[in-house]
């Protein structure tokens, strides 16, 4: 077994994903040391948003090559969602001083995608034709 496969089995992440994690940690440390952590956090969140928009655009592209790029971007955004959510919560904590509002924002940011996904699956179950019986 190659060493890349051993790393993938042990961590669940590919080598390029691990390198991106280390790069983001290095950027956050440099931002902290140079007292520009807020700017670095905003920049990382903006980069995440651009990546999500590019993923959504490329998923509908007629050429297969661009859809494969969208698959890579989807894997990247899935990997980085939790980190981006924590950076957003930290940035919100710099502006909001109400802990209750921060808790609600945290629940919305962290649990929101799971709830939307479950609701979307539930709607799909109601649109089945009568020949596709679903036991409940």
From Swiss-Prot:
Name of the protein in question: Inner membrane protein YbhQ
Record-annotated membrane-spanning stretches: 13-33, 38-58, 72-92, 100-120
A matching Pfam family: YbhQ
Biological classification of the source: Bacteria, Pseudomonadati, Pseudomonadota, Gammaproteobacteria, Enterobacterales
Keywords carried by this UniProt record: Cell inner membrane, Cell membrane, Membrane, Transmembrane, Transmembrane helix
Side Cytoplasmic, residues: 1-12, 59-71, 121-136
CC per GO annotation: plasma membrane
Membrane topology reported for the UniProt record: Multi-pass membrane protein
Periplasmic compartment residues: 34-37, 93-99
Signal peptide span: none
Species of origin: Escherichia coli O6:H1 (strain CFT073 / ATCC 700928 / UPEC)
Localization annotation: Cell inner membrane
S-adenosyl-L-methionine recorded as keyword: no
The UniProt record lists the keyword Heme: no
């Amino acid at each position: 077994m190659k060493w890349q496969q051993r790393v993938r089995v042990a961590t669940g992440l590919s080598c390029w994903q691990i390198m991106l994690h280390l790069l983001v940690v290095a950027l956050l440390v440099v931002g902290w040391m140079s007292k520009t952590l807020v700017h670095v956090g905003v920049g990382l969140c903006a980069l995440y948003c651009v990546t999500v928009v590019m993923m959504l655009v490329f998923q509908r592209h007629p050429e297969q090559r661009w859809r494969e790029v969208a698959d890579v971007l989807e894997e990247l955004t899935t990997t980085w969602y939790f980190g981006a959510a924590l950076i957003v919560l930290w940035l919100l904590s710099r502006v909001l001083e109400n802990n209750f509002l921060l808790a609600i924002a945290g629940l919305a940011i962290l649990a929101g995608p799971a709830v939307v996904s479950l609701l979307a699956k539930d709607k799909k179950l109601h649109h089945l034709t009568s020949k596709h019986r679903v036991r409940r």
